[in-house]
From Swiss-Prot:
This protein's record includes keyword Zinc-finger: yes
PTM description: Ubiquitinated.
Zinc finger (RING-type): 191-232
Entry EC number(s): 2.3.2.27
The protein's name in its UniProt record: Non-structural maintenance of chromosomes element 1 homolog
Length: 266
């Protein structure tokens, strides 16, 4: 009885609007999710006390549980920013993408995904991806078309492009982790600290363990001589900066104040 009571949630218009808008965006950073939550309260229940974000999302997830859908929290691999995405637990994300992309476009994504997973850096060059166009299933695709499809994946937040190379967006990692673990068991990389799927990060040159950049930053945060957590050998890589939500919040407030100041001046 206690279990069933715990799983029952109450969806108000606030929750429904929040869910609808999150679905529209696909993925949002935590700062934007909090703003979205506040917006939904202002529209539907201005006088209500805004729930803690964690409680608010847990309430929605308890209702979505029977539909095999969940709002999942993750962090970006490059700088550790918290993100949220609506994840379909019943199907692989590639099949979920089928409503937005043609068969040959989905196959292009699979090819890109495989190159990214197999690479040491977590990136695949556009050249290497485009060289596989002739092997695609379905309708033939020219390289120029393939370039446009890759940009479509970027716009839809499935891929990130940096200097002509592609890696998985945080949304894709959140939605596809289980699929990637099952499909590429021999090539998949796992972070030694958080034990989640790792696409890009740093590795120990002695024992080979890997760590996400945000995990590296936190683990060695106050360590003058960083050493590998597994073999204790010297860690030779540059230690990235830790994402600081307080500084980010202050920055957001400053930007907001500047915008409002500019709007008053016009």
């Amino acid at each position: 009885m206690q279990g069933s009571t715990r799983r029952m949630g109450v969806m108000t218009d606030v929750h429904r609007r929040f869910l609808q808008l999150l679905m529209t965006h696909g993925v949002l950073e935590e700062w934007d999710v909090k703003r979205l939550q506040t917006h939904c309260y202002k529209v539907h229940d201005r006088n209500a006390t805004v729930d803690k974000l964690e409680d608010f999302i847990n309430n929605i997830n308890s209702v979505l549980e029977s539909l095999y859908i969940e709002i999942k929290r993750g962090v970006t691999e490059d700088d550790g920013r918290p993100i949220y995405a609506l994840v379909n637990l019943a199907t692989t994300s590639i099949s979920k993408m089928a409503t937005d992309f043609a068969e040959n476009e989905l196959d292009l994504f699979r090819k890109a995904l495989e190159l990214i997973i197999d690479s040491e850096t977590g990136f695949a060059s556009s050249t290497n991806i485009l060289n596989l166009v002739d092997q695609l299933k379905g309708k033939k695709m020219r390289k120029k078309e393939a370039e446009q499809v890759l940009q479509k994946f970027v716009q839809n937040k499935w891929l990130i492009e940096k200097e002509g190379e592609f890696t998985l967006h945080g949304r894709a990692i959140l939605e596809m982790e289980q699929y990637i673990r099952e499909t590429y068991p021999d090539a998949v990389k796992i972070c030694n600290i958080c034990h989640s799927l790792l696409i890009q990060g740093q590795s120990c040159e002695t024992c080979g363990i890997r760590m996400h950049l945000p995990c590296v930053a936190k683990y060695f945060q106050s360590n003058a001589e960083p050493r590998c957590p597994h073999c204790n050998d010297y860690w030779p890589h540059e230690i990235p900066k830790v994402f600081d939500p307080e500084k980010e919040r202050e920055s957001g407030v400053l930007k907001s104040n500047k915008k409002s100041l500019r709007s008053r001046q016009h």
